[in-house]
Amino acid sequence: MKLAVYGKGGIGKSTTSCNISVALAKRGRRVLQIGCDPKHDSTFTLTGFLIPTIIDTLEEKDYHYEDVYAEDVIYEGYGGVHCVEAGGPPAGAGCGGYVVGETMKLLKELRAFEDHDVILFDVLGDVVCGGFAAPLNYADYCVIITDNGFDALFAANRIAASCREKARTHPLKLAGLVGNRTNKRDLIDKYVEAVPMPVLEILPLIEDIRVSRVKGKTIFEMAETDPSLEPVCQYYLNIADHLLACPEGVVPQECPDRALFELLSDFYSRTPVPA
């Protein structure tokens, strides 16, 4: 199974992805998480450090792909989850999307996809240009991380449009939304009423999740010494169980930008402002 996780920048994709990866590993699956972001910090909470990127390794090898081995680019993180970071070009130069495409090419040559039960792509923000949309060409399911706010749902809608486009030539389905750091879901419900898709889970604002990111640990690792965090782990196990059940998913039909803007902004305009 191949999963592509997208969402607005800063929404908590990487933290969520790492915890989903561990949850899948705890369900007995061999998991490979691939960070597709020039910041190369997707797998930080799994490994506890910024692992060398594929671009770093290729530079060391003078871009001789035949000299790159799996152990050069794949690192083992918490729970036995294997980790890869694509990396990116220097700031202001080159194309990060191209790097993602080359990463897919190298990992296929290394047969990394064949050695794992689940491949999880954690992809840069809501940028869905051709290069950063490349993981959708490989994915069985897309998962969108959002919150209960206008900007995140607007980004989710653009990602849904990319899923619909890719599904024309590839058997891709949108597994659904994960609400992150949100104590309300009224705007999420309004969106999925307009653009039908499953809501896999809603995670409230939990300070320990934010702290886990700073500490470079998954919530599962923190729960080993703090059993009170086990209910938090259950959110991610619920998502993992849903995905492992091979859900039917949907091919979404996104809302036109102007219609979505009116839909969501109308909600805010009708919400009473406290005195």
From Swiss-Prot:
Superkingdom in the source lineage: Bacteria
Q: Which GO terms describe its biological process?
A: light-independent chlorophyll biosynthetic process; photosynthesis, dark reaction
Sorted keywords for this record are: 4Fe-4S, ATP-binding, Chlorophyll biosynthesis, Iron, Iron-sulfur, Magnesium, Metal-binding, Nucleotide-binding, Oxidoreductase, Photosynthesis
Q: What is this protein called?
A: Light-independent protochlorophyllide reductase iron-sulfur ATP-binding protein
Identify the cofactor(s).
[4Fe-4S] cluster
Q: In which pathway does it act?
A: Porphyrin-containing compound metabolism; chlorophyll biosynthesis (light-independent)
- Co-factor binding comment: Binds 1 [4Fe-4S] cluster per dimer.
Q: What's its job? A: Component of the dark-operative protochlorophyllide reductase (DPOR) that uses Mg-ATP and reduced ferredoxin to reduce ring D of protochlorophyllide (Pchlide) to form chlorophyllide a (Chlide). This reaction is light-independent. The L component serves as a unique electron donor to the NB-component of the complex, and binds Mg-ATP.
Q: Catalyzes what?
A: chlorophyllide a + oxidized 2[4Fe-4S]-[ferredoxin] + 2 ADP + 2 phosphate = protochlorophyllide a + reduced 2[4Fe-4S]-[ferredoxin] + 2 ATP + 2 H2O
Enumerate the residues binding [4Fe-4S] cluster.
95, 129
Record-linked NCBIfam families = DPOR_bchL
The residues the record assigns to binding ATP are 10-15, 39, 180-181
According to the record's subunit comment, the protein's assembly and interactions are: Homodimer. Protochlorophyllide reductase is composed of three subunits; ChlL, ChlN and ChlB.
**What's its EC?**
1.3.7.7
Q: Which HAMAP family match?
A: ChlL_BchL
Question: Could you cite one Gene Ontology molecular function of this protein?
Answer: 4 iron, 4 sulfur cluster binding
Record family assignment: Belongs to the NifH/BchL/ChlL family.
Native organism is: Gloeobacter violaceus (strain ATCC 29082 / PCC 7421)
**What does the entry list as the binding residues for Mg(2+)?**
14
